[in-house]
Amino acid sequence: QECIRAKSPITAENAINIGITGGGVIDGSGDLWRPVKQFKLTDRQWEALMKKSQYTIDTKEGGIWMPTESSFKGNEHNIQLDAENALEKASEYYDFYRPVMVSLRHCKRILLDGVTFMNSPAWNIHPFFCKNLTVRNVTVSNPYYAQNGDGIDVESCKKVHIHNCTFETGDDAICLKSGKNAVARQIEGPCEDVYIHDCLVNKGHGGFVIGSEMSRGIKNVLVENCTFLGTDVGVRMK
């Protein structure tokens, strides 16, 4: 389901034969974007955040720190894509609409190899309706308190091979999705033919997760020889 987001710093759409490879580090400066829940931090960590920004939201779980005035007001207004003049209205609250760090949409023959992806504003890697995707020898790292800090969210993709990767995230590590609600079901596109093996998840909500957005279906998936050490749940079906 389409939604309002800031432009991803790394984006490809309708591209063929693309790769992000090598031993480098891609840092998304997520601390400048992400809200932080107070209960996930020590008192000293919370005090340090409050010196950077005084904007907070009160909830039953405690406070949520917002990094900027724009993100704080964006949360209040929460403009959705189906609103009249939505993009124009949302631009005033740009910081609220956190981007995924790597967005790959309708691409074919993709290789991610050897790179470290870290500190993303929202999800780290989001392949969407892609075909022939290989992710190997990749490290994905986010702080344990990173809100929506998923490792990789493979959505409605075909022929996916993820192996020998290491994840440490603030949310789900390896996640398969296929769209949300009736809007998603208008377009055929299950997530299918996925092979995941020899991956290590040091920390995260779920090590390997299906859902929660799965309206177009998920099929033909094999996960083996993976190690989940510090996850809340190893394998999770939402």
Model-based region annotation:
Residues 1-238:
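Extracellular/periplasmic carbohydrate-active domains that bind, remodel
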